[in-house]
A protein has these predicted regions:
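Accessory terminal and edge-of-domain segments that mediate assembly/interaction
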Residues: 1-104, 112-195
Length: 195
């Protein structure tokens, strides 16, 4: 059912009947349930090469093709894929991965910060201030989205067991990198955003 609004970005359709399915052209592809979806550029391809991963499929976009790797390691099989920059492209590729069988997806990468945070420390978002457009096509409009506490707890437990430092944060999602004005950054910081 469509939730209508004067501003199209705030409209939402809860009906999941897509015009084009995410696995269009790859209906027979069955990917592993576990997936690492990394915003790490060429490091993903480098790791896949070193791990002797196989390419299960190549996801084609108008700017770049993204190999979808299958890695076999320590008796486990998982999917590995580089995530594209930008919410629309990243969501499109993630939809494809999910439609082909990925159910447990962990994403990692780097980010900019608004406050003084230590480098080389994992940041675990607890909520996100939604200032981009893509998420509004997946969930009804709201200022924030809270991240699933069970998933967050599992990630934090794993990092604690491995003695890897981390910090929780509130993140600001935006599609306008060069429109992060001084005043807007200060405003977001006053709302508790640190990334």
């Amino acid at each position: 059912m469509i939730q209508k609004h004067e501003l199209p970005i705030l409209e939402y359709d809860s009906n999941s009947e897509e015009v084009i399915r995410p696995n269009h052209g790859a209906e027979q592809l069955k990917l592993p349930e576990k997936c690492v979806y990394a915003f790490l550029g060429d490091a993903v391809d480098d790791y896949a090469f070193e791990a002797e991963a196989t390419v299960a499929e190549t996801f084609e976009t108008i700017t770049r093709n993204y190999p979808v790797y299958i890695v076999k390691q320590d008796g486990m099989e998982f999917c590995l894929c580089a995530a594209p920059l930008g919410a629309p492209a990243a969501a499109q590729l993630m939809d494809f991965l999910i439609s082909c069988g990925c159910k447990k997806i962990i994403s990692t990468g780097s980010c900019g910060v608004l406050t003084d945070l230590a480098e080389n420390e994992f940041l675990i978002p607890v909520k996100a201030l939604r200032d981009e457009g893509t998420s509004y096509h997946y969930l009804p409009a709201s200022r924030y989205i809270e991240l699933n506490k069970n998933i967050r707890d599992a990630i934090e437990h794993t990092l604690l067991v491995q003695n890897i430092p981390f910090q929780e944060c509130v993140t600001w999602t935006t599609d306008g990198f060069f429109r992060e004005t001084r005043d807007m950054v200060e405003y977001r910081k006053s709302e508790g955003c640190s990334t």
